[in-house]
Structures are given as C-alpha cells and as structure tokens.
Amino acid sequence: MAEAATGFLEQLKSCIVWSWTYLWTVWFFIVLFLVYVLRVPLKINDNLSTVSMFLNTLTPKFYVALTGTSSLISGLILIFEWWYFRKYGTSFIEQVSVSHLRPLLGGVDNNSSNNSNSSNGDSDSNRQSVSECKVWRNPLNLFRGAEYNRYTWVTGREPLTYYDMNLSAQDHQTFFTCDSDHLRPADAIMQKAWRERNPQARISAAHEALEINEIRSRVEVPLIASSTIWEIKLLPKCATAYILLAEEEATTIAEAEKLFKQALKAGDGCYRRSQQLQHHGSQYEAQHRRDTNVLVYIKRRLAMCARRLGRTREAVKMMRDLMKEFPLLSMFNIHENLLEALLELQAYADVQAVLAKYDDISLPKSATICYTAALLKARAVSDKFSPEAASRRGLSTAEMNAVEAIHRAVEFNPHVPKYLLEMKSLILPPEHILKRGDSEAIAYAFFHLAHWKRVEGALNLLHCTWEGTFRMIPYPLEKGHLFYPYPICTETADRELLPSFHEVSVYPKKELPFFILFTAGLCSFTAMLALLTHQFPELMGVFAKAMSDIFCSAEFRDWNCKSIFMRVEDELEIPPAPQSQHFQN
C-alpha cells in the first residue's frame, strides 16, 4: 500500500509539473477569464478607481522617498551580489533559485536520470570528471618550518589555508599511523599529534615521543637462553617524530636534513623488522605498510633537501634509487621531482626518457608532464623561431610539433602560461593541488619558470602560440580536443586551497550573472527617478498622475502618448512653441 501511494503521489506530481511546464499559457488565460467573470463580485472597477484617487493625492515628496528607498535597496542587493560572486563565483539569487525554486517549478533530478539512463560512455566520463576534481598531494611541496613559516615571519601573511593544512593532517594520519600504534607509547603519542591543530602542541608531542624512548623503552633480554647474563637494549626511536620536527620545527633546510637523516636510521630499522613479520597476520601487514610509507617519505624529502642545498646530482641518484626500490608507490609522484632535478642539470635526454615512461595514455596526466614535453619540443626550434618568418613561409614539421605540444599543454592546464610569461604574480605553492586548476599552475611555474627562461626563445614561442588553443575548443566545458572537457569544479576547490590575498585564475572567464546586471540597472534607474523627482517635483508629479490614470482608468485604450504630454502641458501652463515664418507659409 505504501509503495502504491508513493507511486500515485509521484505520478500526480509529475502531471502537475508537466502542466506547469507546457501548459502555462492555458493556465494564464484561465486566470484572466476568472478575473473577468468575477470582476463584479470582486469590485475590480471600484478598487481601481480608489487606487487612482489615492495616487492622485500623493505629493512629490512621496515619490522622492519611494524612488530613493528603491535605489538604496537595489544598491544593497547589488553590493551583496557582487561580493558573493567575487567570493564564490556564482550569483546568490541564481543559486537559491536553482536549488530551491527549480524543483518546485519542474526541475528534473539529474542524479536519478543519470543513474537510470546513463550509458557506459557517460559513466566513464563521470569517473574521469571525479578523478580530475580530486585534490592531490603536491609532489614539490615546501617545508613548513624552513620555508612557509619564514614567509609568514617576513610578510605577515599565511601562505597556507586551513583547508590545505587539514588535508595534510589527513594524509599524515593515513600514511604514518596504523591500528597497532596504541601498543607502542611513542606511536600512540604521534597518532594524537597528527590530529593536533596547534603547531606548538604537535612539536611538543614529537619531543615527548622521543623522550619516551630514553625513559620507558629499556627492555632486558638474555644474551644466552640459559644464562644469567643480561643486556640492556633500547627500542628503536620514533621515526615519525623526527619527520614532524624536520617539517615544522627546523628553520633551515640544513636543520631539516639533519633531522631527516636521524629519521632515516629509525625508519630503516622499523622497516626491516616489519618486513620479516609482514606475513604473520593482518596487523603486521598493516604495520609494514605504514613503515614502508614512512621510509619512502623520508628518502624523498632527503632528496628534496639535497636539491634545495644545490647537490642536484646527489638528489637525482637518490630519486632514481627510490623509484627502483619501490616501483609500485606512484602516489608520491617521485618522477615529477626527478624531472625538475634533471631539467636543472640540463640533462634533456634523461628527461625525455622519463617522459617516455610516464607520459602514457593510461596514466593520469599533470602539468609537469605536459609542459615539460612541450618545453623539450620547443627547445628544438625556439632559438630560430620568428613569427614573421613563420607567417611568410609557414611552419616546419618541427615547429608544428612544438606548437601542437604547447596547445596540448595549454588545453590540459590553461592557467600556466600567464605565470610563465609573468603576466600574473606568483605565490608560494600550496601543499595540495587540483589538477588542471590554478593551484597546479602555481606549483608548476614556481619551480619550472627558471627552466623555461634557460631555453632561449621558449617563452617567446609560448607567447606567440598559447592563445591559439582556445580557438580549437570554443566550448571547453562541453567538449575538449585532446582531453576530457574542462571540469567546472576547479574554481571552487582552488579558492579553498589558495590564500585569500591571491586572485584565483578562472577558466573559462565567467560573464556577470543576470541578477547583478539587473540590480545594477534597477539601482541606476530608481536613482535617476529620485533625482528627477527631487529636481522637478511638479513635472514628475503630473507625469506620475497621468501614468496612474492611464493604467487605472477603464478607458485606458483610448489614450496615447500624445494625450499624456498634452495633459502635462495644460496642467503646467506651458505655452506652445512658436512656429517659424517658413512653416506658416
């Protein structure tokens, strides 16, 4: 019974929605017919006469107050709409209308229709759009204590948003903790430390975890099973505590590297022990997975420290060894760190070899991969490229390949060229990025701008060709050329990831919503009426009375514009304009 009643209500609702959607003209004429039939009982003519009499008794001060109040209200609405649009990228009135009024006036539930009628291709595109809107860990993220905090000390600005730091805290809990942490006092403390919001509380917890190893972790083990000779043995120190101190307490890269080397000793020992016990149960397997993540993170950050300190060849060797030792851990995107270090060494053949492995159709793309491939192809022709010569003789095969590579990169992330061409100011990259978004463009340009400048003519070629991409994809939100359509979620996610003092790059450029233009026009129109009424009260009063008579009188069909102005002239006693002698003759 309940299902039948629900089905009947849904069918009734759909019929009403259909009637409002397609038969609104019939409803409109029915309402007009009812008003005409009930004009005598409702005393419509008498009410119109009363309204007309009331309007005729109003003074010009009333119209000044009315138009002034309307202008003020519409101005306030305009200011609020503009602020909301600048902050969230959409109109507040439009959003409320779509969210609350559209379902009542015949909106269709897109989720249900997509779930019931979607094909395999649609589901694939939906999965792709979800993956493109996913927030990723920035493989080139800076050190909080040695770089982000120093920026705050100098400028007084916070380079990281709360949303970004919260995502980092979730990553740390995922990679550096496991279910058996409560069995080890130091790991139990660090499990709470990763959830702390206060940086000083996290640092204090890390120091406490290290002190526990010195005080409470001494165990006695016999040297020989049947012997009375005993040995005092220290349990391994907490590697994750050293990681936290290196990331947040160290004020220089050298201090961070020293702490990461201590973390490497502790983490390597834990990894070797858990590797031997990983097959003894699910608990040991989870602990081994955690120790693997810790070890990979430490080695990667040590390589980044070497890169920051100028030991680029050493950093490249460490990254290569790490990728060989753990080839399946692609979540850290170590190959992007390797590409940047190889570009610094100008080892372009090695860069091409890395791209040949990772620039694959089955792997997720990134701005680093696309723009590095474009840089290598531009390097072959950029030193001799001239727009004038190319327009006369046409593009050669190599130049065409370079231009196509640039178009491919710009289609993937259209925000990067403005930073590479220094048309937009750079800020410190966030700890997380959104692929194809402004955050990824900042992270790429922050580290790779120097590599583009080093290649002679590369930026000139980019400047001459990058805008041609948009002619191939006139509707990027609906259909792409080489990639999926550009996701519409990038602006919202980038506003959460990037600090408030940065102006987020938006693609494609949004036009001003209708309601902002409408309220601006309404505010201007009512302000003009208020000014005219204040300056010419008698003329505007007569004009308002004439208009009210036209719309309220039963004989409004016999009036025209000429009668309005004749009445205005009669009541103001305006003499007729003198006619010229030529006109009289």
UniProtKB/Swiss-Prot annotation:
Membrane topology field: Multi-pass membrane protein
Gene from which the chain derives: ST7
Annotated transmembrane regions: 15-35, 62-82, 512-532
GO cellular component, one term: membrane
Identification of the protein by name: Suppressor of tumorigenicity 7 protein
Record carries keyword Lyase: no
A Pfam family this chain is assigned to: ST7
PANTHER family to which the protein is assigned, alphabetical: SUPPRESSION OF TUMORIGENICITY 7, SUPPRESSOR OF TUMORIGENICITY 7 PROTEIN
Positions bearing carbohydrate: 47
CDD domains according to UniProt: ST7
Organism, scientific name: Papio anubis (Olive baboon)
